[in-house]
Structures are given as C-alpha cells and as structure tokens.
Amino acid sequence: MRQQSSVARLLASAAVTAILAAGLGGCQTVSDITGSLTSKPDTSPDAGLRHSVEVAGESYRANPKDADAALAYGQALRATGQRAQAAAVLEQATIAHPGNKDLLAAYGRALADNGNFQQALDTLTRAHSPDNPDWRILSVQGTVLDQLGRHDEARRYYASALNIVPGEPSVLSNLGLSYVLSRDLPKAEEVLRQAYSSGKADARVRQNLGLVVGLQGRFAEAESIVRADLPAAEAAANVAYLKQMLSRKDNPRGGPGTVPMASLSGPG
C-alpha cells in the first residue's frame, strides 16, 4: 500500500491551504496538519486493514463485554477512518470497564478524531496518572490542547513527555507543529530539525520539516528534504504545488483555485 503519510497529502492538504489563506489563523487546528492524534479517513483502505476490521469485528460481536476485543475493534475501526463507530464501540467498553486505562486512552483518541476535544482531554486525563505518566498520552493531550488553541499549555505537556523520553522525534514533531499553529515558523523549524536529526525520525517528521521550510519560501531545500521519501519527480511536483499556493496567497486576485482535500495521517 502506498504510504498514507506521503508528502503529496501534506502539501495538498486543506490545512496548508488554510495556513496560507489565513496566515495561520486561530481557527486552524493541529489535527489538520499532523497525524499524531487524528487521521482523516482513507477512502480506500487496503485489503489487510479491511481484513483486520472483519476479524476484530467478529471477535467483538462474539463477546462485546471483552475489553481486549473492544480495544482491538476500536483501533481497527480508527485505522480505516470509521471514526464515529470507533468512538461508539470504545464508549461502551469504557462504561463496562471504567478503570481500564488502555480503553480510556483509545476512547480519548477516538473522541478527538470526532472533534470532541474537551471531552477527549477529560478522558485522556483519566487514562494515566501523575505518579505514572504515559509520554504517548501526554503528547496526545498536547495535540488536543493545540486543537483548543491553548498552545502554551500544550507545550507544557510536550515538555513533560520529553522529560520521560528526551529527544523523542514524534513529540518534537508535535511541538514543532504547535509553533506552526502560533505562527512562529523559525521556532517550528528549530524544533523539527531536532526531530529530524534523530536516528528514529520517520517520514512524517521529514515531511513536516519540509513543509515548514517550504512555508518560509526555501523551496529547493524543502524539496531536498522530502525527496528522501519520494521519487524525485513527485517531490519536485509537491514542492511546486506548495510554491503555487504561496504565490496564490501573495496574489489573492488569482483566486483560490481547486485544492485537493487531504491530510497527513499516522498512528494514533
């Protein structure tokens, strides 16, 4: 299957369009840019994902009170973009197992997928405890706070996560995108370069850095960054598309044109 987090999706995203059109306005949300928390539905999930949903669904229907079965089914539904159903399954599971932190964490993510950010934050708070924090949940809480426009508070959560896993590129990537949302592109680039320099940095980190570099008008450099994950021709085409959108922002008389609606996605 083609990698879902391709830079083509990133550079053609509604998020980038909104950033360019609104100057990173307050209505923009981190879920539109990063897949660390919420991923948009894939219109054509591959056969492996569909099979996983079928298998998990059969197990769940055979024993809907089983926490592990509900968790697996909810995660499979999320992976194929079936957000509302995932939230419904996980909600029932958390009612049956109110103290199950894995279920609470998954339900919190599913709530965020559906745009219920405050409820997601409340649920995620119950998914771990101050004396035993989970850095992954801290990072997700940060992205939810960014969705709510509470960027300073979000960064405190990222800092707490980084205290547990110093230099973790996925957390640094979320932190960098938080700075994108507050219009501080140089700081965003600084943080994303920290993530980029990690031996554990994945394609999402490189694509996010390429986006931020491109948003600052350094297109050749952006192309060299994203080329690591794409054929040269595709990388060039995507950076050219970003350049076109930037030109469109600077010349509004050119009209908005037609922009494909897609976004970066990744593990939740």
Predicted regions and their residues:
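Canonical tetratricopeptide repeat
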Residues: 72, 106, 139-140, 174, ...
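N-terminal leader/linker segments that initiate helical-solenoid repeat arrays
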Residues: 2, 6-10, 16, 20-72, ...
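Terminal, low-structured helical/coil segments at or just beyond the last alpha-helical repeat
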Residues: 31-36, 199, 203-205, 212-268
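Helix-start (N-cap) detector for alpha-helical repeat units in TPR-like alpha-solenoids
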Residues: 67-68, 101-102, 134-136, 151, ...
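Structural marker of alpha-solenoid helical repeat scaffolds
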Residues: 62, 96-97, 127-131, 164-165, ...
